[in-house]
């Protein structure tokens, strides 16, 4: 019978350790930004030595880029899945709720994408792509209704901008305002 005071710790595999460092890095970058984060802090929070972090990523910027790439892919998938099927209005509503669900479920990732100037270019590109997709959806809906399609570009810019800004506001205010994503 083992001593209950002795805890046997299993050593993490390389992929498990990498995943842990990405998760710790994401949380730290969201809290402090790229410039305010050090590899020492990431190592300390992960309970490893600094050389272990460098072994997996080489540099702080490389770790940051990988975190940003994961979050961009995750958010792109949310948007793409939301607008891939259904009627125009339902597709856009699903995209809005999908974005808010992403903010709720991946707060650190959204904070990095939307607020850190280093990753903001990628977020701007993602919003530009979303605007293009929404423009096509609105243009097709306008055409089916016998309306001029040309305002679709303007309306899509307004809609995507409004939703993006609302998501950033909700990130800060959802708890104090008591607002869930369905209400927003």
Task: Identify what each model region corresponds to.
Residues 62-71, 78, 123-126, 130:
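Alpha-helical DNA-contacting segments of helix-turn-helix folds
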Residues 31-35, 106, 145:
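Short coil/turn segments at alpha/beta junctions that flank glycine-rich nucleotide-binding fingerprints
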Residues 24-31, 74, 78-82, 91, ...:
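Solvent-exposed, amphipathic alpha-helical segments
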Residues 66, 77-107, 155-159:
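Hydrophobic alpha-helical connector segments
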Residues 1-32, 36-47, 62-65:
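Basic, helix-initiating cap at the start of DNA-binding domains
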Residues 100-124, 135-139, 165-172:
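Amphipathic alpha-helical segments used for helix-helix packing
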Residues 47-57:
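Short hydrophobic/aromatic patch on the recognition helix
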Residues 73, 120-144, 153-161, 165, ...:
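Amphipathic alpha-helical packing segments from all-alpha helical-bundle domains
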């Amino acid at each position: 019978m083992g001593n209950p005071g002795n805890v046997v710790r299993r050593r993490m595999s390389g992929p498990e350790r990498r995943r842990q460092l990405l998760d710790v890095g994401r949380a730290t970058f969201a809290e402090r930004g790229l410039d305010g984060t050090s590899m020492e802090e990431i190592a300390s929070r992960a309970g490893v030595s600094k050389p272990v972090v460098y072994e997996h990523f080489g540099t702080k910027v490389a770790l940051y880029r990988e975190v940003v790439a994961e979050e961009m892919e995750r958010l792109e998938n949310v948007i793409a899945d939301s607008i891939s099927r259904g009627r125009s209005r339902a597709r856009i509503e699903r995209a809005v709720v999908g974005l808010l669900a992403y903010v709720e479920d991946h707060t650190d990732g959204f904070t990095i994408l939307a607020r850190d100037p280093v990753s903001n270019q990628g977020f701007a590109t993602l919003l530009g792509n979303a605007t293009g997709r929404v423009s096509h959806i609105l243009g097709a809906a306008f055409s089916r209704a016998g309306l001029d399609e040309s305002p679709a570009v303007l309306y899509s810019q307004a809609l995507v901008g409004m939703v993006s800004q609302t998501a950033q506001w909700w990130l800060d205010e959802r708890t104090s305002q008591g607002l869930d994503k369905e209400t927003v």
